[in-house]
Amino acid sequence: MKGAFQIAKIADIPVKLHWSFVLMLVWVTIEGRRNGMNWESVGWFAVLMLGVFACVVLHEFGHAFSAKRYGVRTKDIILSPLGGVARLDGLPEKPIDESVVAFAGPLVNILLAAIFGGYGWLTSSIDLSNLGTSRLVFGNPENFVTLFLLINIFLALFNLIPAFPMDGGRIFRSLLSPSLGRRRATLITTYLGQGMAVLLVVLAYFLVPPRMSFYLIPLFILSSAFMFFMARQEYRMVKFEEILKKHSISELIRQPVNVFKKNDHIAHALEILKRGLEKDFLVKNEDGTIAGVFSQPEIVEVAKSISTDSHESHEVKEFISLVKETISPSDSLHVFYKKLMSQELRILPVFENENLIGVVDIQQLNDFLRVEYEMK
């Protein structure tokens, strides 16, 4: 996601924050002061908001760790004012496994609610009597146990709504898939998600108090739009998956026009890239074996990061990406896509009987999908 920067790395999973999160903290400060909070209360309010997003991070790690159990890698976890998302390389093939990964996130919130509830019960620190009577309650640390109990209950229940893009949508689809098929189950859940998005705006219009409508109504509209289009995107992804599984690498394999040697200079790579015939390249060792790959984003980034005078002194081998998994002509395009994403590459060599017979790159796949999708 553009505009997100890394703030931590936990269990080899980068945790990133979108820049708009900073705007949310500014909003917290302005709204707190506008509603009579002193600076100490505003500070505690900000701490509360950070605590909420800590709960969201733990929720996303629930997905990440459960996905790892099924061999699915998590690229990163991104936080924004709309929530968090664990970007997985894919989902388990079996519906029951997908439902386990989906439920793992809300389960974390259920466990957190149990922890806060248990602590509050043991210490008699849960007090629901003054909630909603004043916004100052959010700036009082004495209410945090109660608030985090309620927040985690809300996060669990909200995410279990049986509609995309919530976790409950994936669980609901996994229950429908065995009898209806994955595509039809996804379509039904997509319609539910879009219906929920519209309903959310309608409810916000009638239920949000007038004094809070100036900032809550736009937030509800933005969240609903996100839900609506993400639900649609989920169905598109399933259609793409079906196409990928029906076609093989042999349909897209091509011979590379240009192949770099690992001691070629960056100036040479940049010159070849400018010709526009290819954007992704193989890099070979002196004995003809594959040393790695070098693609347009990396070439441009390297060329910009060093002075023009240095383009002749730096070699391609300093910046190439290694290829850990290759493909064969009989592999499906779905296998190709998964291997491409898991290695964060844009091109893969194709081998048959240990002999290099060609390449397939991401641009070919995108063009193929675009034509196939339009023909449906």
Which residues does each predicted region cover?
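Hydrophobic transmembrane alpha-helices and their immediate loop junctions
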Residues: 1-376
